[in-house]
Each structure stands twice: as C-alpha cells, then as structure tokens.
Amino acid sequence: MANLKEIRDRIVSVKNTRKITEAMRLVAAAKVRRAQDQVLKSRPFADKLARVLENIQSRVQFEAVDSPLLSKREVKSISLVCITADRGLCGGYNTNIIKKVEIRYAELVKQGYQPNLILVGKKAIGYFQNRKDRYVIKSTFKELEQVPTVKDSEGVTNEILAEFLSENSDRVEIIYTKFITLVSCAPVVQTLLPLDPQGIAEENDEIFRLTTKDSKLLVEKSNIEKSDSEKLPSDIVFEQSPDQLLDSLLPLYLQNQVLRALQESAASELACRMTAMNNASDNAKELASTLNLTYNKARQAAITQEILEVVGGSVV
C-alpha cells in the first residue's frame, strides 16, 4: 500500500484536476448558449432567402436557367469539405467526423471518382496531412471563431466556388457534425454543389437552451415553428433576368449553408466538450472519494500498528 504522503498528494492532484474540468464545463456551457443564440439570429435571413428562392422557382423553371451553380455535369472529381475543431478535449467529436470522412473518401475512390479534401480545423489538418500519400488535400482553414460568423464562412465559400466554377470539382459535399441535442450529435454528409434550393429547411428544428436551477444546469427544449411562405404576386415583373437574380442570390444561399454547417459543428463541439468535462469531473469526484477511503484505511492501519508497538513495548 502506498504511504500516506503519496496518497495525500494524489488526492490534492485529483481535486485540482476536478476544478479545472469543472471550469471548462461551465465555459463550454456558456459558449453553447452563445452558439445557439447565433444560430437563432441568423435564421430570419436564411429563412427569407430560402422563401425568395422557392418563389422564384415557382415562377421560373431552374432547368431553363443558365446558372453555373445549378448546372449538373458528368461527375469525375468531388471535393469533400471536412469540418473539425481546432482543439481537443471534446470526447469523440473529432474522431467521429474524421472516420466519416475516411469512409466517404474510400467510397468515392471505389466508385471511380477522384475525391479531394478541403479541411477546416486543426484536428483534420493535422490528421490528413500526416497521410498525404493516401489523401489529396486542396486547401485548409484553421483558427476560426468558436462562434462562427459570416466572415468565417466567406473564405470556405469562396474556395468551394472557385473549385466548382473552374470545374476542378464537379460536385462538392460537406461533412460536418449535426447538432441534435446537448448529449447527442452525428456526422452528416450534405451536397452543397450543384445547388438544390428545395432541399433546405430549418423549420421544426429543436433548440436546446441551457438554464440553471438550484445551481445546476438544466436543458429546456423548444421547437421552431414553421414559417408561412410569402408568395410573390403573380403579376410581379423582375427588372433583372432570372439568370442575374440567381447569380446574385445563389452565392448568398451557398454561404448561408456553409455558415449553418459551421455553426452546427461549433455547437456540437461545445456540447461534446461540456459532456466530456462533466464526465471527467464526475470521475475525478469518484476517484477522490476512493482515494480518501484508501487514505483513511492506511492512516487507521498506521495508528493501529503504532498502538500495537506501544503495547508490545510496555509488556516487555
């Protein structure tokens, strides 16, 4: 059995570690709330933009519009946009998304396509750059804001547009972590280009808000109600041609999709970190309790031994 000083030092170390993990949990919880608020603030613009595109589509057949972002050509090369975190200590968040990318990459190679990677986040960059012999990396992005903004999405969107419009990539897919609940998230694959505005909807999403009660974190769940689509008047006359309208709106639409993926990934990362730090705090508490018990047993054994030695000496 370890001596009393070693056990006591380990108890102090575990308690200090618990203070750190508890602080990280609270910081992550606060940032999750900020990330969700950012998603809510961006919804009105995203929703209105989707409605405008739907209404234009009802007036104009997209198939008849000559827009490069809508053109579907023979697919040879596919770009995969991978979104991970810049930091660790968030459970299996980074590992799960990297595994998803590896599986999708292997599927595309097996199907005869030529995939390449656009990496967002230091974890993805570090992992795939160490495996350059197996993966083609087009570009990398790192050190984005923890709560992504429009500025963060611009660089990624511009790279995606450049690859697609130059025909270096015939299709662009984004792989990110969809935020489901505070304790549940899942890697998903979504096709970004060529665009299909009918495939986007944010209605009836569940929003999970963090609240406090009796000094404990609680979760409140609410649904986003479906918004009424405002139909454009049937006699409206567009000053610009449909091509000009869509050339202006579709890049905004694409950037909104990238921003949404970044925001959901950020919320998922923070939720995973909060859960991981909560588990670490619980484990530290349990370990400290076990060490205290071990310490008390060792101390009791030492006292008993001293008493026996004193009694034995007096008898002699």
UniProtKB/Swiss-Prot annotation:
One of its GO terms (molecular function) is proton-transporting ATP synthase activity, rotational mechanism. It holds the Pfam family ATP-synt. Coiled coil: none annotated. Keywords: ATP synthesis, CF(1), Hydrogen ion transport, Ion transport, Membrane, Thylakoid, Transport. The keyword Chloroplast does not apply. It is a peripheral membrane protein. Produces ATP from ADP in the presence of a proton gradient across the membrane. The gamma chain is believed to be important in regulating ATPase activity and the flow of protons through the CF(0) complex. NCBIfam families: ATPsyn_F1gamma, PRK05621.1-2. F-type ATPases have 2 components, CF(1) - the catalytic core - and CF(0) - the membrane proton channel. CF(1) has five subunits: alpha(3), beta(3), gamma(1), delta(1), epsilon(1). CF(0) has three main subunits: a, b and c. This is ATP synthase gamma chain. The lineage of its organism: Bacteria, Bacillati, Cyanobacteriota, Cyanophyceae, Synechococcales.
